A protein has these predicted regions:
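Cysteine-cluster motifs in flexible loop/terminal segments that predominantly coordinate metals
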Residues: 277-288
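Catalytic phosphate/nucleotide-handling subdomain of diverse soluble enzymes
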Residues: 47, 57-59, 63-71, 150-166
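Internal maturation/activation junctions in enzymes
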Residues: 8-24, 28, 50-142, 214
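Contiguous, well-ordered alpha-helical segments that form the cores/surfaces of helical PPI scaffolds
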Residues: 31-46, 62, 144-147
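Single conserved hydrophobic/aromatic residue that forms the stacking wall/gate
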Residues: 1-7, 11, 289-290
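Generic structural signal for well-ordered, non-membrane alpha-helical segments
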Residues: 5, 11, 33-37, 57-72, ...
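Catalytic alpha/beta core of large soluble enzyme barrels
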Residues: 12-15, 111-116, 125-132, 137-274
Length: 291
């Protein structure tokens, strides 16, 4: 309940003005939130899963079901305490329609639709008492916040164990969390032979999210003949994402085969030498809290 309650309080405070009255009116009456994941790659690695493992799809399905269920439950409870958002009656939620009612049924080919929570009781409570927010879940890139929290970017596989990110104060080196004992569990983006596993992970997430997730497609030319990505591969990815219910896509990443001009092994050894394995996740050189 903490994220939805904290985010809801933002509407109490006037942090900035609105360019037009219509924007202010809609914002305050809809009270839309967009809460999402950060560090999914780390979560899968901790559970010994790779993006192309069918067990990873089930794990992500269960995680996202719980995530959306408790977001709705929290917003419903806030509505009981403080009242529903003014535009609640303009949402599908007011009609008793939940994300589990509208997802592409093809997703059931990835993970069977065996739900673990009491959605029907929640549905009844929502139609009776409403929601404090018109929307709740959305997936952000979290490029900057992942640095502060020492997490992998949003729902994306890391491009390497050590990456260099630009900031106003110069380049920052960031190592994946728990590298010493999870390095063999991570899915590395440019080592992926295809996008199939990633596409399915995002698809089972979209089943529960109430706003569109913008996923990415990534290609490493080294995995293809003559270092050229066939158009047929890209077209197949496009059709597959549509089949499984993606709403939007964002980037089409291609490995340009250029390094970040750092010796990855040497840099990793230097960073890891500054703290023990037990201290790794809290080590200052790895947490990269940059003020």
């Amino acid at each position: 309940r903490i994220p939805s309650s904290a985010a809801s309080d933002v509407y109490k405070r006037q942090y900035q003005g609105y360019p037009v009255k219509a924007a202010e009116n809609s914002t305050k009456k809809r009270r839309s939130l967009g809460i999402g994941f950060i560090g999914l790659a780390h979560y899968l690695a901790k559970n010994g899963e790779h993006y192309d493992d069918s067990s990873a799809w089930q794990l992500t399905h269960d995680l996202t079901e719980a995530f959306q269920y408790y977001l709705l439950k929290s917003s419903n409870q806030l509505a009981k305490e403080k009242g529903k958002c003014e535009y609640f009656d303009r949402t599908k939620y007011s009609q008793g329609i939940l994300p589990i009612d509208t997802y592409k049924s093809d997703v059931d080919e990835i993970v069977p639709n065996n739900l673990k929570y009491d959605w029907e009781s929640l549905r009844t409570s929502i139609t009776t008492h409403g929601l404090r927010h018109s929307t709740l879940s959305a997936q952000m890139p979290s490029e900057s916040s992942s640095i502060v929290s020492n997490a992998t970017n949003g729902i994306e596989p890391p491009r390497d164990y050590l990456s260099v990110k630009k900031s106003k104060k110069g380049p920052l080196k960031q190592i994946v969390p728990s590298y010493s004992y999870l390095k063999n569990n991570y899915t590395i983006l440019w080592e992926m032979k295809n996008n199939d596993g990633y596409i399915k992970v995002i698809s089972v997430m979209q089943k529960f999210f109430d706003q569109a997730i913008s996923g990415n497609w990534s290609y490493n030319p080294e995995h293809f003949e003559d270092n050229e990505v066939p158009v047929s591969v890209m077209a197949n990815d496009l059709l597959t994402t549509y089949k499984y219910g993606w709403k939007t896509s964002y980037y089409q990443n291609t490995n340009d085969l250029k390094s970040d001009e750092i010796d990855v092994k040497e840099s990793l050894d230097k960073l890891l030498g500054e703290c023990s394995v037990e201290q790794e996740d809290d080590c200052e050189s790895l947490s990269l809290i940059h003020i």
